[in-house]
């Protein structure tokens, strides 16, 4: 998926194991500002703990990663009946406000749809962000650390 932001083209790509892009995404995650998930996400990339169809996605401006998301069977919540999770949606501060998170989410939705899923779920603490992308608030959920987040869902066809 390509989008143009002024003079900069943003490309969303699926990240495959043992590729240059996977190594670049790991370096991006090891340095990003979302401290609460940085180590967990870096470990998942280092160990490549993605199974079957689970995968990360990267948003690139030129050859530089500026954002990411993942799609997985499970997330940091004791809710095994919910699947697939679009998670770890992150855009570097300089590139925020340019709808890159929307593009990452849409790319993950397209991927899920191609796999035969009809609904996707996003956990978040944000209010008003995912609603703009067609998600609806389902309920508050408690993660394994005991923190409360919001669960959003979207029918994707």
Functional labels for PLM-detected ranges:
Residues 114, 118, 124-148:
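Conserved active-site alpha-helix within GNAT-family acetyltransferase domains
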Residues 58, 64-74, 85, 90:
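Conserved beta-strand in the GNAT
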Residues 1-20, 156-157:
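Conserved N-terminal entry element of GNAT/NAT acetyltransferase domains
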Residues 24-25, 86, 104:
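Residue-level preference for hydrophobic side chains embedded in well-ordered alpha helices
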Residues 54, 147-151:
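Short hydrophobic/aromatic beta-strand or adjacent loop that forms the aromatic wall/cage
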Residues 30-60:
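Active-site rim helix/loop that mediates acceptor-substrate recognition in acyltransferases
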Residues 91, 97-110, 122:
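Conserved acetyl-CoA-binding loop-helix of GNAT-fold acetyltransferases
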Residues 74-86, 96, 144:
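A conserved beta-turn-beta hairpin within the catalytic core of GNAT-like acetyltransferases
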